[in-house]
């Protein structure tokens, strides 16, 4: 489904980035980094409405020829960015939304770990396994 999944801290540094295939890793890192400007624009456009809103899904941030970039923001302003292959036309908006909810739940589990210091890179096997299950297996 996804070819790159990133968790970005409130201060815009990466807590976790995973991409496949690895030969395009730098390209995906660039796409995630550039999408943060769009995330900030969407958050500021929503203004106070975002505080009252329970749904933090930002939707499609921007499409490219080969990929689509989607975003999600938590209440603590941690950003989730997902890059999806554009050729996968069967993937619907509600499926992307449920993938972000699953990612958010797993991130919450990481945050509840007493040995995790908020702001550190995420190095959880359970989180990594969940992200791997969302990634496309490219042959």
UniProtKB/Swiss-Prot annotation:
Keyword Endoplasmic reticulum: yes
Chief localization: cytoplasm
GO BP terms, alphabetized: endoplasmic reticulum to Golgi vesicle-mediated transport
InterPro entries: Longin-like_dom_sf, Sedlin, TRAPPC, TRAPPC2L
Parts forming coiled coils: none
Domain of life: Eukaryota
A Pfam family the protein falls into: Sedlin_N
One GO term describing the cellular component: Golgi apparatus
Cell compartments where the protein resides: Cytoplasm, Perinuclear region; Endoplasmic reticulum; Golgi apparatus
Record key words, sorted: Cytoplasm, Endoplasmic reticulum, ER-Golgi transport, Golgi apparatus, Transport
Family: Belongs to the TRAPP small subunits family. Sedlin subfamily.
Protein purpose: May play a role in vesicular transport from endoplasmic reticulum to Golgi.
Subunit structure, as described in the record: Component of the multisubunit TRAPP (transport protein particle) complex, which includes at least TRAPPC2, TRAPPC2L, TRAPPC3, TRAPPC3L, TRAPPC4, TRAPPC5, TRAPPC8, TRAPPC9, TRAPPC10, TRAPPC11 and TRAPPC12. Interacts with the heterodimer TRAPPC3-TRAPPC6A.
Full protein name: Trafficking protein particle complex subunit 2-like protein
The organism of origin for this protein: Rattus norvegicus
Gene name tied to this protein: Trappc2l
């Amino acid at each position: 489904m996804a070819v790159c999944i990133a968790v970005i801290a409130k201060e815009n540094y990466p807590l976790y980035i995973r991409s496949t295939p690895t030969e395009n890793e730098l390209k995906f890192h660039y796409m995630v980094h550039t999408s943060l400007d769009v995330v900030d624009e969407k958050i500021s456009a929503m203004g106070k409405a975002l505080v009252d809103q329970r749904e933090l899904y930002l939707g499609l941030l921007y499409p490219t020829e080969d990929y689509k970039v989607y975003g999600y923001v938590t209440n603590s302003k941690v950003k989730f960015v997902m890059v999806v292959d554009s050729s996968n036309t069967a993937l619907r908006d509600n499926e992307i939304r449920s993938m972000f909810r699953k990612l958010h739940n797993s991130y919450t589990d990481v945050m509840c770990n007493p040995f995790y210091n908020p702001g550190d890179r995420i190095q959880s096997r359970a989180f990594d396994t969940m992200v791997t299950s969302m990634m496309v297996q490219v042959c």
